[in-house]
Curated annotation (Swiss-Prot):
Family annotation (InterPro entries): A/G_cyclase, AGS_C, Nucleotide_cyclase
Reaction(s) this enzyme catalyzes, per UniProt: CTP = 3',5'-cyclic CMP + diphosphate
Keyword Transferase belongs to the record: no
Record-annotated disulphide pairs: none
Annotated keywords: Antiviral defense, Cytoplasm, Lyase, Manganese, Metal-binding, Nucleotide-binding
EC supergroup of this enzyme: lyase
Source organism (scientific name): Escherichia coli
Protein residues bound to Mn(2+) 2: 127-128, 171
Catalytic activity, EC: 4.6.1.6
Name of the gene this protein is made from: pycC
GO biological process: cyclic nucleotide biosynthetic process; defense response to virus; intracellular signal transduction
Protein's name according to its UniProt entry: Cytidylate cyclase
Amino acid sequence: MSIKNLYKNLNDEMGSISKRRKNNNISFNKSTFDSHAMDALNTSFENYEDISLEGFESYINESASRTVIERNSLVPLKDYDAVHSLRNAFGKPPRDNEPRIGTHPEFKHLELDNRTDTGYVVTMFMDIIGSTKLGLSYSPSDVFLFKNNIITGAIETINAFDGHVHRIMGDAVMAFFRSRQNEQHDTLENSVIDAINCAAYFIEVMNEIVKPQIKEVADENIGIRIGIDLGETNYVLWGNYGIPGVNEVTATSFFVDIASKLQHKAPKNSIMLGQNLVEKLGLTVNDYLTYKLKDGQPDRYIIDFTSKNQSRLRYKQYLLNQSKYFSILPHGLKPSRIKVVISYSNDELGLVNRKDYFNCSSVIPKGKWVKFHATFCEEYGEHYESLKFKFRVVNNGLDASKKDNYDNHETEIIKKAYEKENGVFTAIHKEQTSYKGLQHMYISVISNDTVIEREIPCSIFIK
């Protein structure tokens, strides 16, 4: 399923809004709406007499006078299918509760008194950039609807990945990812993965839906920026700020503040990750991370501070390689005739504590056995006497880097025609989890030394 189909309502509404600009009676200079700096606007206006203050006021008033019935259409349609499909793709059970804003549900008790509590949190900040000139291209109601559709899509994606919307600040959203279950089982990484996957999907929405729609009718340089970081339990304090009636339960942490700074440093339609989060997952610059460039040089640090006593605080920032990472997520995988079911267990036979796994959905502890159950179905008219399944391991991270060639290896399994059932060949291969980080199993199908189905990735986070 494509992103456009996944977020069908958002795609349709963005298309409707963007095309309404064509019918506006006011004629603005097209160069006004390109990606140049805003100071070019005044120059553009000086060259055109048809842009009058009276005309612009009339344009504003026309939108403001819309009927109540018309204004009801400003409420975005929810993409329930997107939430459901995303949760299915990552093996998450249905989420019954409607999303709420404000205090995180696990800290509601702090609203009643002046106590504080500790608890880890993954904080995500997202904001819309480059939208200032939309008000010159569209009516205020369409600008509102345009921004609100983006905000609504972000909220639904956050909800799909078990996040909690804490604040909406104009055209920005602040969300928390955490759960008591992950805290109790020491699987904070799962909340980190949820936040990254959430952000990656919504960047893809901007790239595949919003950006193309708006570019059809105007040269708007619109996008979003996302910053994410992890604060572990002993470094995050939850408490009730304010006075009764004017109060908010929120998280206080260096890492919450850093997430906000990362968002401001992120390039358009990009995700910036903090050092603590990256180290927790075991990611490295060699796999799915890079550095933002500043004056042609890597901009490695979001904080680089030397105190009066000459002690130095340095905190790294990383840019997620969006296209590379999204390509291994369920909706980024290329169509393939190879189908794979992944599971893991405590023993090689798969008898003890067996669990299903979905690409990039959660962490698996070291020492577990992962089973890859691969199938390949012959098409009409095909008949293979034998097929070879190739299982190719590609490891990443500091743990694996200490081994020769990262301990990368291949295993080939040959299946004869008499072993297939109803035209379906099956091969099963098992590997033990050994190295922290994001590791991959690439599976392909070969006949007579010719690849008949290219590699598909099975990507697993190992704790």
